[in-house]
Amino acid sequence: MKRVCIVGASGFTGGELLRILLQHSGVEVVCATSRKFKGEYVYRVHPNLRGFTQLKFVEPTIDAALKADVVFLALPHGESVKWVPQLYESGVAVFDLSADFRLKDPNAYVEWYKWPQPHPYPDLLAKAVYGQPELHREELVGARLVAVPGCMATASILMLAPLAKFGLISAPPVVDAKIGSSGAGAEGSVVDLHSFRTYVVRPYEPVHHRHIAEIEQELSRLAGKEVKVAFTPHAVDIVRGIFTTGHVFVEKMPTEADLWKYYRALFGDSKFIRIVKDRLGISRYPNVKYVLGSNLVDLGFELDARMKRVVTFAAIDNLVRGAAGQAVQAFNIAMGFPEDEGLRHIPVAPI
């Protein structure tokens, strides 16, 4: 039984970590921190947890976290880096859901996250495992510092990974992403208020979005060469979910059989990835509607011979597979639990 502390447990991601870990047979949640809600019952902030826990929020301190064997950091970017060195040095396993240990180049944090200087702990950065289980499974076994990938990066990387791995990417892919309002977090801003967000389809950070750094890092690793990506996200009028479409212009068109072979080679054994390309039924390509509440990734593709283009698709729940669920999946592999422990959720439909 692993004793777990969730630091930053009052936000959407923290709430999802609680929801999942409270159902995990190998975990005891001993600590949930929140400066704002210190002393309050967890279920008063996360009403869906009423009747499942009597846990109260505590002040976020290193001492509180060190009562656990494993710490999940659900903190804003730039905050986790203040916690990780001492936790790691104390022997605690850390699963960081911020971006603070995702990028391998210390200098990348200056460009992509506007840090005033390169990453202050390059040694820990080198030790951190990028926590995308399907692509880093062997590295995750026994890992003590895991950087959980970003939500839109997760969908983008997984849908393009087979094309990168099997040499189809010669020109920069173009990625269009759409994300629900929960991606902005529990605090939000004025544009996340109901009157602004309802009916919206709005681009934001249309160039140089920070998730590009992760996408390029991982696709370059798979391709064995530098891969650059044109990426534009959009805020849309849903609460949960991410849908990404990738456009890959190729030198030589693959066949449909080739693409099935590539996707199955990379993801055929995955417990959570479904290849959705059907000739019948009401959902012939991936659809956010049919992954909500789950750790599933639905991937699909189509061929455009006229334009020598492969179109790829991915649908995930941003709070589960894009954050808490992927963190627990990585935790399970690292700690020797069944990979799907606590994550056997069939998506809710209709919704």
Swiss-Prot record:
It is found in: Cytoplasm. Keywords: Amino-acid biosynthesis, Arginine biosynthesis, Cytoplasm, Lysine biosynthesis, NADP, Oxidoreductase. One of its GO terms (biological process) is L-arginine biosynthetic process. It is an enzyme of class 1 (oxidoreductase). The active site is at residue 151. Pathway: Amino-acid biosynthesis; L-lysine biosynthesis via AAA pathway; L-lysine from L-alpha-aminoadipate (Thermus route): step 3/5; Amino-acid biosynthesis; L-arginine biosynthesis. This is Putative [LysW]-L-2-aminoadipate/[LysW]-L-glutamate phosphate reductase. InterPro entries: AGPR_type-1, LysY, NAD(P)-bd_dom_sf, NAGSA_dehydrogenase, Semialdehyde_DH_NAD-bd. Involved in both the arginine and lysine biosynthetic pathways. The keyword Oxidoreductase applies. One of its GO terms (cellular component) is cytoplasm. It catalyses: [amino-group carrier protein]-C-terminal-N-(1-carboxy-5-oxopentan-1-yl)-L-glutamine + phosphate + NADP(+) = [amino-group carrier protein]-C-terminal-N-(1-carboxy-5-phosphooxy-5-oxopentan-1-yl)-L-glutamine + NADPH + H(+); [amino-group carrier protein]-C-terminal-gamma-(L-glutamyl-5-semialdehyde)-L-glutamate + phosphate + NADP(+) = [amino-group carrier protein]-C-terminal-gamma-(5-phospho-L-glutamyl)-L-glutamate + NADPH + H(+). Belongs to the NAGSA dehydrogenase family. Type 1 subfamily. LysY sub-subfamily. The gene is lysY. NADP(+) binds at residues 10-13, 34-36, 318. Its EC number is 1.2.1.103, 1.2.1.106. One of its GO terms (molecular function) is NAD binding. It comes from Pyrobaculum calidifontis (strain DSM 21063 / JCM 11548 / VA1).
